[in-house]
């Protein structure tokens, strides 16, 4: 056990009783029990086949892939996220129990990739929909890079204070109204227009076609520009 990561765990009494804080104990218990939900939409997702195999064996980190968001505390997004898929991703994130984490894997997930140059339906970065903890660039990232990202996330978990994380996730929650297309004079066929609507209800109570959620207070056109 690393005393640098958990300084309170190094205090022992003559009877060899460890004294610590509830926060450090909770973080330590979650280090080896991160259960990921694998969310893949394109080619980067194929790297998980190598990662799960015997050569890299990411089970040694306590990672157990789950098919239900209610059983997962980590979601790995890989591939391009379109406007049509964005509500589904937001809903999956909302259904995950706290504390929860996000790893954005690949150029398409982080920036929209090559599909973002002339596409009106590609989200320019998954961090406009959900908060991202670790960015993993690459096209596609190698399995070694994915393991490095998981290691960095584990270090973040070990230093985390749960109350601070909960407060930070409640800020800058923003939704958008229905999407509308308008004819423009540019060379492109249509211009994408969205209106903003601040709400306090959860996404599970709103129709999926009626909103998009992203992390910071950005203008609506930044989803696609």
Curated annotation (Swiss-Prot):
It is a peripheral membrane protein. Binds 1 [4Fe-4S] cluster. Coiled coil: none annotated. It is found in: Plastid, Chloroplast thylakoid membrane. One of its GO terms (cellular component) is chloroplast thylakoid membrane. Signal peptide: none annotated. Keywords: 4Fe-4S, Chloroplast, Iron, Iron-sulfur, Membrane, Metal-binding, NAD, NADP, Plastid, Plastoquinone, Quinone, Thylakoid, Translocase, Transport. It catalyses: a plastoquinone + NADH + (n+1) H(+)(in) = a plastoquinol + NAD(+) + n H(+)(out); a plastoquinone + NADPH + (n+1) H(+)(in) = a plastoquinol + NADP(+) + n H(+)(out). Its cofactor is [4Fe-4S] cluster. One of its GO terms (molecular function) is 4 iron, 4 sulfur cluster binding. GO terms for biological process: aerobic respiration; electron transport coupled proton transport; photosynthesis, light reaction. PROSITE patterns: COMPLEX1_20K (PS01150). [4Fe-4S] cluster binds at residues 43-44, 108, 139. InterPro entries: NADH_UbQ_OxRdtase-like_20kDa, NADH_UQ_OxRdtase_20Kd_su. Gene3D superfamilies: 3.40.50.12280. The keyword Transport applies. Transmembrane segments: none annotated. Its EC number is 7.1.1.-. NDH shuttles electrons from NAD(P)H:plastoquinone, via FMN and iron-sulfur (Fe-S) centers, to quinones in the photosynthetic chain and possibly in a chloroplast respiratory chain. The immediate electron acceptor for the enzyme in this species is believed to be plastoquinone. Couples the redox reaction to proton translocation, and thus conserves the redox energy in a proton gradient. NDH is composed of at least 16 different subunits, 5 of which are encoded in the nucleus. This is NAD(P)H-quinone oxidoreductase subunit K, chloroplastic. It comes from Nuphar advena. The gene is ndhK.
């Amino acid at each position: 056990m690393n005393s640098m990561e958990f300084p309170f765990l190094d205090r022992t009494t003559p009877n060899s009783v460890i004294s610590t804080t509830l926060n450090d104990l909770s973080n330590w218990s979650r280090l080896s029990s991160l259960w990921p939900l694998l969310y893949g939409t394109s080619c980067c997702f194929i790297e998980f086949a190598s990662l799960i195999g015997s050569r890299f064996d990411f089970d040694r980190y306590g990672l157990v892939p789950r098919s239900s968001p209610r059983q997962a505390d980590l979601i790995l997004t890989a591939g391009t996220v379109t406007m049509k898929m964005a509500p589904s991703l937001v809903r999956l994130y909302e259904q995950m129990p706290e504390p929860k984490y996000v790893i954005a894997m690949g150029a398409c997930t982080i920036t929209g990739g090559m599909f973002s140059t002339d596409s009106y339906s590609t989200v320019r970065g998954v961090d406009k929909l959900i908060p991202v903890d670790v960015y993993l660039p690459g096209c596609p990232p190698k399995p070694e890079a994915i393991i490095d990202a998981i290691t960095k996330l584990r270090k973040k978990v070990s230093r985390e204070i749960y109350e601070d994380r909960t407060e930070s996730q409640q800020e800058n929650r923003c939704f958008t109204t229905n999407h509308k297309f308008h004819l423009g004079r540019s060379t492109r066929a249509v211009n994408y227009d969205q209106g903003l609507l601040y709400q306090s209800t959860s996404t599970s109570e709103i129709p999926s076609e009626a909103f998009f959620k992203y992390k910071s207070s950005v203008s609506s056109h930044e989803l696609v520009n």
